[in-house]
């Protein structure tokens, strides 16, 4: 059976940046890696209502800088920035170094694979029909400007006795093209029948020489040539 490589992992260092960017000695590497995992776990649990897409961690000069990419920055910041200060103190305590927290707003959540997957998972938990949730996500992404999207749900769909998976795709999703800007993420929906897995692939365009994704022009059809002698 055909197995697919992780779309983000294969593009690291080519078109995708790492979500942890720091250098460390051999003796500190494991501690830093474990610290990153604990910080991410804490922030994801703390900011469940904030539509967090990803958390980027940097470690400049004996400190830690955390950038939270979210579609709802107001929820993270809180009233007069009080919530950010609480988060900063907690992250500093977890990491054991001075912490700085930056907020990056996601202006088009319909084009973010993690947010789309979480949205579908939440709808399934509210007993929305899975086909309706999938089709709505696909239509929204294509309307906003995606060049292609694929959504897959797996599990006891609709409370069925036998688990299965169903997928829906629109546009192009070229997984083998390394220069293609493919955003991929997963989520889980915990229903009364069990866990339903959600996978989302979004194709935003092609990255050329580190430039922003280029929107391809539709190809014009060549006029048919008439046979000679007619």
Swiss-Prot record:
Gene3D superfamilies: 3.30.300.20, Ribosomal protein S3, C-terminal domain. Transmembrane segments: none annotated. PROSITE patterns: KH_TYPE_2, RIBOSOMAL_S3. SMART domains: KH. Keywords: Ribonucleoprotein, Ribosomal protein, RNA-binding, rRNA-binding. InterPro entries: KH_dom (IPR004087), KH_dom-like_a/b (IPR015946), KH_dom_type_2 (IPR004044), KH_sf_prok-type (IPR009019), Ribosomal_S3_C_sf (IPR036419), Ribosomal_uS3_bac-typ (IPR005704), Ribosomal_uS3_C (IPR001351), Ribosomal_uS3_CS (IPR018280). GO terms for cellular component: cytosolic small ribosomal subunit. Pfam families: KH_2 (PF07650), Ribosomal_S3_C (PF00189). GO terms for molecular function: mRNA binding; rRNA binding; structural constituent of ribosome. GO terms for biological process: translation. NCBIfam families: rpsC_bact (TIGR01009). Part of the 30S ribosomal subunit. Forms a tight complex with proteins S10 and S14. PANTHER family: 30S/40S RIBOSOMAL PROTEIN S3, SMALL RIBOSOMAL SUBUNIT PROTEIN US3C. HAMAP family: Ribosomal_uS3_B. Belongs to the universal ribosomal protein uS3 family. This is Small ribosomal subunit protein uS3. It comes from Shewanella sp. (strain W3-18-1). The gene is rpsC.
